C-alpha cells in the first residue's frame, strides 16, 4: 500500500485517475527493482540467487529431455518463463490495468479496492505467466515473457557446480 500513498502525494501534479494509477505502478516497480537490486548485493542473497539459477538450469535441461548431469545442466539458461520472479512483475503490470477499472477517489476506497482485488490480479497474472510459457517459441509472441526474463537477470545468478548438484537432487 506504500505506492498508493506515495502516488497520492503526487496528486497535485498528476490528478487524473489514469495518471495516479501509472504513478502508483511506477512506484511499485521502483520499489521492487530497488529492493531486489540492493538485496542481491549481500553475499547470502547472491548465493540464494545462484541456487535459483541452478534450479532454472535443471528445469530447462529436463524440459529438453536431456540427461540431468552437471555438465548438461550448466549449459542451460538460468532464465525460465514460468519463474516466480516473472509472476511478481506480472502482478504489477496486470494490476495497473485492473486498477484502471476502479475509482481512485477517495483514498480510503482506493486502499480497500487494492486489497479486495488482490485475488483477481494474482489470478490474471498467473494466467499471463502460463501464457508466456506457451508462446515462448512463437516469434513475436515470445516478447510477452521478456519483462519477466529481464527481472530474472537480477533474481538469478550463474551457479557453481556444487549448487547445480544440489538443484539436481
Annotated model-derived regions:
Residues 41, 48, 61-64, 88-104, ...:
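Short hydrophobic alpha-helical module
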Residues 119-122, 141-145:
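Alpha-helix N-cap/helix-start motif at coil-to-helix transitions, marked by capping-box chemistry
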Residues 1-15, 91-115, 119-122, 126:
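Juxtamembrane "helix exit" motif at the C-terminal ends of alpha-helical transmembrane segments
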Residues 18, 22-29, 33-86, 134-136, ...:
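Polar-ligand-bearing catalytic/cofactor-coordination segments
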Residues 3, 7, 32-42, 51, ...:
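Alpha-helical transmembrane segments of polytopic integral membrane proteins
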Residues 112, 132-135:
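Accessory, usually C-terminal, subdomains that scaffold auxiliary metal cofactors
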Amino acid at each position: 500500500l506504500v505506492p498508493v500513498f506515495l502516488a497520492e502525494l503526487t496528486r497535485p501534479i498528476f490528478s487524473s485517475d489514469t495518471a495516479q494509477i501509472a504513478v502508483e505502478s511506477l512506484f511499485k516497480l521502483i520499489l521492487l527493482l530497488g529492493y531486489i537490486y540492493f538485496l542481491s548485493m549481500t553475499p547470502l542473497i547472491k548465493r540464494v540467487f545462484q541456487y535459483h539459477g541452478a534450479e532454472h538450469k535443471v528445469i530447462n535441461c529436463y524440459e529438453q529431455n536431456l540427461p540431468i548431469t552437471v555438465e548438461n545442466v550448466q549449459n542451460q539458461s538460468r532464465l525460465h518463463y514460468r519463474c516466480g520472479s516473472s509472476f511478481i512483475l506480472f502482478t504489477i503490470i496486470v494490476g495497473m490495468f485492473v486498477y484502471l477499472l476502479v475509482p481512485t477517489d477517495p483514498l480510503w476506497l482506493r486502499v480497500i479496492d487494492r486489497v479486495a482485488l488482490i485475488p483477481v490480479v494474482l489470478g490474471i497474472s498467473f494466467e499471463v505467466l502460463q501464457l508466456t510459457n506457451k508462446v515462448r517459441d512463437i516469434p513475436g509472441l515470445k516478447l510477452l515473457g521478456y519483462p519477466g526474463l529481464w527481472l530474472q537477470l537480477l533474481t538469478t545468478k550463474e551457479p557453481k557446480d556444487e549448487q547445480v548438484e544440489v538443484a539436481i537432487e
